[in-house]
Each structure stands twice: as structure tokens, then as C-alpha cells.
Amino acid sequence: MIQDRPPLILDFDGAVSDIPGAITLPLQAWQEKIRFGCRWAQFKQLETALQAQMPGDYGCVFTGSGDYHHLSQLLLNRLPTQQKFQLIICDNHPDNMRYPFGIHCGSWVYWASRLPQIEHVHVLGIGSQDIGLGHAWENHWSPLLKRKLTYWNINVDTRWMNWVGAGRSNRAFSHPDELMRAFLAQFDRSLPVYLSIDKDVLSPEVVNTNWDQGEFLEQHLNDLISACQGQIIGADVTGDVSAYHYESKFKRWLSASDGQEELPEAQVQIWQQQQNELNSRLVARINQGWRR
């Protein structure tokens, strides 16, 4: 019997715990630098530090709050460059926004789309107005125009993408069931998969996060993971919840402009328990899908 790869917790914020067999790296000292976003020099410093700390073999990586989704880029950089694969992201946001100060949790998909080993990037479950007309100019258009990136959205008016010539990189649906059926119907099961799940793609009926949330149910994630069985070469999960007060006024302003509020600690603890129960279920499913 092949042993499951041990889950790995990159513990910046204390949000993730109680995952059986997980390896935990304490990284709280990096929280102020890395959370929400950072300069490229800081990102590279963390990347170098983790090279000495991360185990040689690990399974699904948990990064804590969705404020750390840009760490997916760091994890992608660790994969062998000679192997082509598809990047499948579940997220209520495109994470393909312009950010001139380095990399942040809402811009990393653009940088991932530039990696030559990635055949295509799919972002499933977008319900955010980040891809609506009012924010069209904030999106990186180049990966959409090159057809390297596809948005799979639910109930967002994205007609502007047709106007700029990127209509074929957008799939619009009125219900998450329709979206998942359509995606799985065209899914290339012969190509390895890196799977990145931000739990803000889920309805608040499932779990709560500190970001605006989408309409997916847990079953939609289960269906996707099952379809990837035998092809997953890497996976990460973010979208857990934690309370943090930035020392940086700039980060406090950025966070507030994205609609984030500082949560009471009692509320955080209740939500974390629900999140950790879901995390354990996701790990069990992902462990069935590794490419051997």
C-alpha cells in the first residue's frame, strides 16, 4: 500500500489545525511581511527560507487565510519545470488583478499564467464583481487574450470581455451545477493537475470566510476532486479564517478597501472549527487523487 503524502500546514496565522498526520511549519514571524501581499524581494526571501524547511515529500498544503493565496505561486515554482500540467483553481475571485507593488492574494494567477509548464489556467466559481465591467481595467487582459486563462463565472455580467476580444476565455453560468457539469464535460483527464482551492468559492451555508463568498457547495468540490483522480501532482487549500491587525497603514487600507473587517476572536474560533472539519474531509478526498 502506498502511503498518503503528509499534509503540510504553512502556519502564518494559526488558522489551521487538527489535520491528522500533518506537518506544521511555524511561520508567524512572516505574517506582517507576507499577509495580503508583499514586495517581490520579501517573497523571494520567504521562498529561500522555505527551501530549507519544507520536507522533500508532502501532500496538500494549507496556507491559512485567503490573504495568503499568493503562496500558491511559491508552491508552483517548486514543481519540476519539464512536466506540463493544468492549473485548476476554485475561487470566488479571479486573482488576476493588477498590483504594482509586487505580488498579492488577488494578483498571483497572472504570474502563474506566465509559467511555461502550465498548459492552461481555469478559475472556477467566480461570483465576484472583480470581473464585472466596473473592474474590467483592473484585470490582466493578456492571459485572457492569449487563451491561457479561462474564467468560469456565476451570474456576473462579463460582456466587456467580448468587446475586448477575450470572450472565448469566459464561460458564464447561472448556477454552480451547470458550471461544474460544463467544466467536467471538457476536462482533459490525460493532463496532470495542480489544484488550488480557496474556500471563499463556497456558499456561507458551508463555511464562513473573511472574504465575500460564492455559491459552490462541498459537493461541487468533491465532484471536481473525483474527476482529477490519479492526476493530481500538487494541491493547496486556503480560505481559512483568522483575525489580524496590520502594523502597516497601507495594508490596513488595502484590506479595508476589499471589504474585510476585523472579526471578534470568539467568532473566529467558531468558524475555525467548521473550517478544520472541512479541511480534514478535503484532505481525505485529495489523498485519493494523487498521481502515482
Where are the language model's segments positioned?
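Conserved alpha-helical scaffold segments that buttress catalytic/binding sites
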Residues: 2-292
